[in-house]
């Protein structure tokens, strides 16, 4: 089920990024990190980090803080991986107040905390039901296609250093 959580939250993150860019009038830029699948893995990995925490840690106001810190740690790690190993940056907070090396910033750390609280309370129960209904054969097939997509995407990023090359729609 964790694999489906990753995929679903990565896809929802992609949709959120597209919506955020549209609402804020942000410069049109690519939001996905794979050639085929419209996924933002930082969202999927961030939610996995939150979901593996003990339930007692993720409830109430302290839980919002814990979840925000967990998701922010993932955001930092994902940014570091892309930068260190592939030479690409999908986001840069260096001009945002309270940033750390342009990888994370206070504003989005607070948003992570609130977003994870909303997801845990209202969205995750539906995601959990959906993941439980998926037959193993579909999971294996999706995993093979995803692994091929990830391999090709990582090679393209490493070769070009240009995340825009991943986008057929250029957006």
Specify the residue positions occupied by each region the protein language model found.
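Aromatic-rich, lipid-facing transmembrane alpha helices and their immediate juxtamembrane interface loops
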Residues: 1-171
């Amino acid at each position: 089920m964790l694999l489906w959580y990753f995929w679903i939250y990565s896809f929802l993150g992609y949709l959120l990024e597209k919506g955020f860019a549209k609402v804020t009038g942000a410069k049109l830029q690519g939001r996905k990190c794979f050639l085929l699948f419209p996924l933002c893995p930082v969202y999927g990995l961030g939610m996995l980090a939150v979901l593996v925490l003990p339930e007692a840690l993720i409830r109430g106001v302290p839980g919002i803080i814990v979840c925000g810190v967990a998701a922010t740690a993932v955001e930092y790690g994902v940014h570091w991986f892309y930068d260190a190993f592939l030479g690409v940056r999908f986001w840069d907070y260096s001009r945002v107040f309270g940033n750390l090396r342009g990888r994370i910033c206070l504003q989005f750390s607070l948003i992570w905390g609130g977003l994870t609280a909303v997801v845990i309370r209202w969205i995750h129960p539906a995601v959990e039901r959906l993941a439980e209904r998926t037959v193993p054969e579909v999971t294996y097939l999706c995993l093979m296609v995803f692994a091929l997509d990830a391999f090709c995407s990582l090679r393209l990023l490493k070769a070009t250093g240009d995340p825009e090359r991943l986008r057929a729609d250029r957006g």
